[in-house]
Amino acid sequence: MSNEISRNWPAPAKLNLFLHINGRRADGYHELQTLFQFIDCCDLLDFRVTQTPELILHSDMSAVVADSDNLILRAAKSLQQATGYPGGAEIWLEKRLPMGGGLGGGSSDAATTLVALNQLWNTQLSNDELATIGLKLGADIPVFIRGFAAFAEGVGERLQAVTPTEFWYLVIAPDAHVSTAAVFQDPLLPRNTPKLGIDTLMSQPWANDCQDLVVSKYPQVAKALGWLLEYAPSRMTGTGACVFGEFSSQQQALAALAKLPSDMQGFVAKGMNISPLIVRLNHP
């Protein structure tokens, strides 16, 4: 078996272009309607297939994340268990995305692990089968596995391909950690946005139902969003803390980035309706 390292598997960030909360289910999960689009800012993963079943992760993050809690290792283990694959893998993570900012980095890392190892191990699961494994690990993982911009419903598992405009975005990552669980448990979170058809949702102004609550509790998010709104239509992604503004050109986005206050961190990225992971899979 080859010891060659398969390099530069991208795990792209996502933006929620809108996020509506339609209700709360008996099991505590929330019914959502949201629009996912990828951006060209990615974590990068390398893989080496091994004959022994051990799974080893190298990362500057791994020292603070228990193996049992790390989505990358859980994803690899889940694929082993689902397929009976007898070997293992050595995995290297280059973390480029902000942690816990609503960009989906952890879910994307897990999805890339499933997609890459399915190919490298030649386990030949379909995307549907990989998405089923991924959904057990996190609600956002299937959209990264399928690799197309999508309108999502339910808890995020029902996906319909869409083609929103591929804007240039200025993404700001405030110095704040927003707990997704705390946001969804907060009694002040709106939970009664009417469910609408996709055509209606795509044609009306977009909003994030979590935004007002998070802005009210996190001054750093409020400050970043307030600054960004001076330059472009802007809102929060996921439950935050990251916010993004839409620009029609890279030049406009970079011009705004150049004016970013010194106490804020941001980057410019391109919207992508086809994930860089799918591009990598089809053009190794």
UniProtKB/Swiss-Prot annotation:
GO MF annotation, one: 4-(cytidine 5'-diphospho)-2-C-methyl-D-erythritol kinase activity
Recorded coiled-coil stretches: none
Active site positions, chain numbering: K14, D140
Domain of life: Bacteria
Pathway the protein contributes to: Isoprenoid biosynthesis; isopentenyl diphosphate biosynthesis via DXP pathway; isopentenyl diphosphate from 1-deoxy-D-xylulose 5-phosphate: step 3/6
Family, per entry: Belongs to the GHMP kinase family. IspE subfamily.
Protein name in the entry: 4-diphosphocytidyl-2-C-methyl-D-erythritol kinase
